[in-house]
C-alpha cells in the first residue's frame, strides 16, 4: 500500500532522539507499505532544519528495507539517505554536508561545531559493519577526553578543549553492532593539535571500554625533528614551519 506524506513542516526532534536512543516503536509499520514523502521543512530542533525533503521509504515486517531521501540545508548544502537490500544484505548510507544538527544530539558530546558526515553500514541478520567519517570539525567539550588529557599531564590541551575547542581534520570509526554491543575496531582522529587512535566496545546502558593512543602534535614534531636533515624538512626550524607545523 502506498501513502502520500506531504506537508509544510514537521518537527522531527523527538523522533530523531528516539532513534538515537533506540526506543522508537516500529509496530505501526507491520505491513508492506511505501511512503512517498514531500515536506517543505523538517526541524531537527529549535535552531536547525532542512528544506524540501523528497523521496521514498519502503517498509516490510517492521523494517525499512529500501529508501532514497534528499533534502537541503538553508545554504543549499545537502542531506542524502539511502537504503538498499540485496540477497539478505542491507546497505545504509547517510551523508550530511552539515553534521552539527545530528551529532550534537548525542548527549556525551557537547560544543560540537561544523563538519560534514559520511556513514556507510552493511547489515546481515542482526549484525552490522559500519564506517563513520566526519571531516573538518571542532570539539569544545568532551568530558571523557578532557579527563584523560588532564590525567596525562596535558593540561594545556585540556584547557583548549574546554575553552575555544580543539579542531580535527578527520575522524573515522569502524565498528560492528550486534544486539546491545558495539565493537569498535578502530577510531582515529587527526588534528593540528592532537591525534587519537582507539579501539574497544560499548554495551548499551552498561559498560564502555576504550583503549588506545593519544599524541599531541608537539610530541610528533619532537620525535620527527630529532631525525637529521629529514626532521628539519618535515618539522621546520621554527614554530608552524614544515609539514607537521603547529
Identify the residue ranges that each predicted region occupies.
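Short, glycine-rich nucleotide/cofactor-binding loops
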Residues: 188-190
Amino acid at each position: 500500500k502506498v501513502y502520500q506524506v506531504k506537508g509544510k513542516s514537521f518537527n522531527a526532534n523527538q523522533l530523531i532522539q528516539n532513534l538515537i536512543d533506540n526506543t522508537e516503536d516500529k509496530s505501526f509499520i507491520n505491513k508492506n507499505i511505501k511512503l512517498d514523502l514531500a515536506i517543505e521543512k523538517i526541524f531537527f530542533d529549535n535552531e536547525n532544519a532542512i528544506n524540501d525533503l523528497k523521496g521514498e521509504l519502503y517498509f516490510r515486517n517492521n523494517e525499512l528495507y529500501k529508501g532514497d531521501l534528499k533534502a537541503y540545508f538553508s545554504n543549499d548544502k545537502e542531506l542524502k539517505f539511502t537504503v538498499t537490500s540485496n540477497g539478505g544484505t542491507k546497505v545504509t548510507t547517510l551523508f550530511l554536508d552539515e553534521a552539527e544538527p545530528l551529532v550534537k544530539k548525542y548527549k556525551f558530546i557537547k560544543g560540537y561545531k561544523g563538519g560534514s558526515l559520511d556513514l556507510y553500514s552493511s547489515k546481515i541478520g542482526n549484525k552490522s559493519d559500519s564506517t563513520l567519517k566526519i571531516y573538518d570539525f571542532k570539539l569544545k567539550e568532551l568530558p571523557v577526553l578532557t579527563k584523560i588529557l588532564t590525567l596525562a599531564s596535558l593540561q594545556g590541551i585540556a584547557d583548549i578543549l574546554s575553552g575555544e575547542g580543539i579542531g580535527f581534520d578527520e575522524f573515522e570509526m569502524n565498528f560492528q553492532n550486534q544486539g546491545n554491543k558495539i565493537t569498535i575496531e578502530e577510531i582515529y582522529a587527526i588534528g593540528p593539535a592532537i591525534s587519537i587512535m582507539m579501539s574497544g566496545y560499548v554495551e548499551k546502558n552498561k559498560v564502555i571500554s576504550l583503549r588506545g593512543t593519544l599524541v599531541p602534535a608537539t610530541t610528533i614534531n619532537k620525535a620527527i625533528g630529532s631525525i637529521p636533515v629529514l626532521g628539519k624538512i618535515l618539522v621546520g626550524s621554527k614554530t608552524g614551519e614544515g609539514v607537521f607545523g603547529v
